[in-house]
Each structure stands twice: as C-alpha cells, then as structure tokens.
A protein has these predicted regions:
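Beta1/beta-strand and adjacent pyrophosphate-binding region of the FAD-binding site
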Residues: 1-12, 28
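Conserved N-terminal/central alpha/beta ligand/cofactor-binding core
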Residues: 26, 32-144, 150, 189-192, ...
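An anion/pyrophosphate-binding glycine-rich loop and adjacent beta-alpha core
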Residues: 216, 220-340
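Internal hydrophobic alpha-helix adjacent to the cofactor/substrate pocket in enzyme cavities
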Residues: 222-229, 340, 442-462
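A glycine-rich dinucleotide-binding beta-alpha-beta segment and adjacent secondary-structure elements
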Residues: 340-432
Length: 467
C-alpha cells in the first residue's frame, strides 16, 4: 500500500505528488489521460498570478497583497472565501523558487501581454513545458505514475478514504488527494447546468471546451452523491469568448481573441450588447464567454479597424477582412444594413479623448446604450476585421468545500485523510468571474498544501499501526 494516492494529472495533482514525495511519502499518481495528453487543462496555461512587494526577475514594479485581493474581490463580486483567497495570494509570492527547483522556468511576457507584466509570471514554453518539467521531476523523485487510469469511484468509511476504484482494480492508500478537474468536458452535465433558454435553445450545445476532454466530473459527482460538502454554482465557470472555428476540445490558448476592448462586439442581429471597455482585458476577458452564451445562437462578432492592429496579441488564425463595413458584414453573415447602422451609431457616440490602452483612458461614448467607457474610438480606418466568437469553457466552479488544510468536508467536519486541490475546489476562491493566472495560483497553492497534509496523514497512520 502506498502512503499517498493522487488522482489527477494536472498542475494541482503534480504539486501534490511532488510535495508529498518531498515529505517522505511513497506516492502513486493516477492520470486518466494517455501519456501524450497528460496534464489536464494545465498543458494549455501560460502564466501564474503572483503577489510581490518589489520587482522580481520577470515581474516588474510591485503587486501587493491588498491589490491582488481587491482585484479578486471585484471579479468575483465578493463571491469568495477571504481567508482562503488570502492564503492563495500570500502563497503565490513564495512558490516560484519551489517551481524552479522542479524545472519550471519563467520568461517576460510577450509584447501583446505587457499589461500583465506586473501581476503575472509567464512560463517558459507555456503550460506544456511546466507539465513536462513536473512529470520529469516526479519520475526522478520516485513518484509512481500510471496513465490511462480513470477512477470512477472511491471507497469511503465515515468520511475517510479507504480505496479508489479504477475499472476492476481496487487501489488502497493511507491518504488521498483528489485533483481530477471539474466537469467542463461533460457536455450532458453542461447542458443540465445551463438548461433551455427563452428562445428554446440549449446554450451548452454551442459551447466549445478550451481544454482537456478528460475532465468529465466523474469523481466530483461521486463525492456529491457520497455526501461531501459542496460549494459553488452549477452554472458558474471560467468561460471565455473564443474563436468560433476552434476545435471542440483542446484548442487551448491559441483560440483566444484579445481585441474585444479595442472595438465593438455585436450579436447575430448586428446589435451591441455590453460595454467592451469596462476594465482592463485580463480582468474582463473571462466574462465574455457567458455574455456570448446569452446571445441568440450563442455567437458574437468582435469588430475592429486597422487602428487596433499592434495593440493586442494577434489571433493565431486571421479573421474576416474587408475594406467596407457592408463587405465585412457579408463575410460574417450579418445583415449589412443593420451592421452599418450599429457601427455608425457607435462612431457618432465616440467622444474625443486621449487613447491609451495601458490605462483606463478618457475615450468613451456619449448617449449610447450600452456605453463603451474606455478605449472608444470610431471604427473608420479600413481595412476592417471581424472574428466570430463562441463560448469557450475552461473549467467549472462547482466543487468540494475545503479548509486551509485542503481537507474534504462531510457535514462540516474535515476528513482525516482525504484532500482536494485544483479545479475540484477552486469554487472556494472563485465563486464567479476570473482574472488571468489565478487558476494556476489556486492549483499550485492547494496542490502543495494537499500534498503535505496527505503525507502527514499517512505518517500518522503508519505511527498508529506500529504503536
């Protein structure tokens, strides 16, 4: 019997496995995916949000605890556990040396992401390099790793872990860490969560999955049925408006379309529906998936002109391009007259100001609904560009309730030897909304906590057995 069983194969699971092994525990990690698809959604990430009180290598200026907390409070509308959130924030200032020890390297942000150079540390080689570094380190330390091993159930006794069931196999351990992701890949569950809208549509049918196809929520559902304490809203998730041409699964970061704040977004009726310049893009990009999901047909269109080029990270795939608004509308399948009218109304509402995309500038509209409060410039410099957008689910927020020790709870009581990290508990910190890089901050923090706590629980059990 191993000391610690880790179920999952992404960032949180790997952090748990590594810290448990460093604490002297024998560790077995079970990854549902085959080796080539290992890493869950972490393989598609690119940065970590970090508190720091002074400049550090790739992080400029400072990003103190209180500012990080206020950013998180705003994007979640207060739907967060402050004690756990501050634990994540403080830990984020101390984790990068540990990450480097396990082979993770950092780089300055690329030119299109300089606005997060103060708040986010970017991984050299992206999330795939991070995942590969952690797996290499785990193998070197003696962590046992098994791929193609989805766990469908647990054997529990009075809120304590006994064994995991994978196929016909029963795998025992002295302690267990659950880090198997949310239910974002489970299209039937997403359909249930979003339901049918007033137009008779099932919005989730038009969702794309930004990450892994293996996060089906099987263990989350099992734990809910087993009576574990739950937190979070079934319909809340990290949901981004992504390129509508993206694949159903594993499109990753390259499907992002980051020009929304530099132009306007219209629905299939060629109507605007939200303030594109409400706040800096890293603090608002994750609301646009839900906004698009609420539109007819769950589709939107991001529209810019040539003045926007160079102010954002260009999408991997070129959008529609035209020298007239009517021609662009035709390419996008929009009514040309309605579209031209919408753009003309917007252009006329734009007030003179000093454009600065690095600040909350004074370029706003007047007498326009919805208003655009920053970076509002007329769309009058052809060629014009358009990108069709669909909701892209990254991960869901429904999860297991935890304390500062990452313990799973049953009827308000923490389990002695069952812990949880990553997406399966992120809803404790993210009740709604998102800000760039915080998912990795949560996974890294609670993965490491869960690993050390599981090792301690296993050690105590071993002492009890020998007593």
């Amino acid at each position: 019997m191993v000391d610690v069983l880790v179920i999952g194969g992404g960032n949180a699971a790997l952090c748990a496995a590594l810290t448990a092994r460093e604490a002297g525990a024998s560790v077995l990690l079970l990854e549902a995916a085959p080796r080539e698809w290992r890493g869950g959604n972490s393989q598609h990430t690119r940065n970590l949000r970090c508190m720091h009180d002074a400049p550090q290598d790739v992080l400029v200026e400072s990003y103190p605890e209180e500012e990080f907390w206020q950013d998180l409070w705003r994007v979640t509308d207060g739907n967060t556990n402050e004690a756990l959130a501050r634990l994540v924030i403080r830990t984020s200032s101390q984790c990068r040396d540990w990450m480097r020890k396990h082979g993770v390297n950092f780089q300055p942000p690329l030119s299109g992401a300089l606005h997060v150079a103060r708040t986010n540390a970017f991984f050299m080689g992206g999330g795939k390099a991070l995942v590969n570094a952690y797996y290499r380190s785990a193998e070197r330390l003696g962590v046992q790793i098994r791929y193609n091993t989805p766990v469908h159930a647990l054997e529990l006794h009075d809120g304590e872990f006994v064994a995991a069931l994978a196929g016909s196999e029963r795998i025992t351990a002295k302690a267990c860490v659950l880090a198997a992701g949310g239910f974002e890949s489970n299209r039937e569950w997403l359909r249930e969560a979003w339901g049918e809208n007033a137009r008779g549509e099932w919005p989730a049918d038009n969702f794309l999955i930004r990450g892994t196809r293996f996060n089906q929520g099987v263990l989350l559902k099992f734990m809910m049925d087993a009576g574990a304490d739950i937190i979070g809203d079934l319909s809340q998730s990290h949901c981004v408006a992504i390129d509508a041409r993206a694949p159903l699964y594993d499109g990753g970061i390259c499907t992002r379309v980051d020009c929304v704040s530099l132009g306007i977004v219209v629905n299939r009726d060629a109507e605007r529906f939200y303030d594109e310049g409400e706040d800096f893009w890293p603090k608002r990009y994750a609301i646009w998936g839900r906004l698009v999901a609420q539109q007819p047909g769950q589709i939107g269109y991001s529209i810019i002109d040539s003045k926007a080029i160079g102010h954002f990270m260009p999408p991997v795939f070129p959008g529609a391009q035209a020298n007239t608004l009517a021609e662009l509308a035709c390419q996008l399948g929009l009514d040309a007259e309605k579209f031209t009218h919408t753009v003309t109304q917007y252009n006329q509402a734009c007030q003179p100001g000093h454009f600065d995309h690095t600040l909350l500038d004074d370029c706003a509209t007047k007498n326009l609904t919805p208003a655009k409060t920053h970076w509002a410039r007329p769309l009058d410099a052809p060629p014009y560009y358009g990108y069709a957008l669909r909701p892209g689910i990254t991960f869901t927020y429904l999860g297991l309730k935890v304390n500062e020790r990452a313990a799973v709870h049953f009827a308000g009581h923490p389990s002695r030897n069952l812990f949880v990290a990553g997406e399966m508990m992120a809803g404790n910190v993210l009740g709604k909304g998102y800000t760039a890089g915080v998912g990795m901050s949560i996974g890294t923090t609670f993965g490491r906590i869960a690993g050390i706590e599981a090792a301690r629980a296993a050690h105590k059990e071993a002492q009890h057995e020998t007593a």
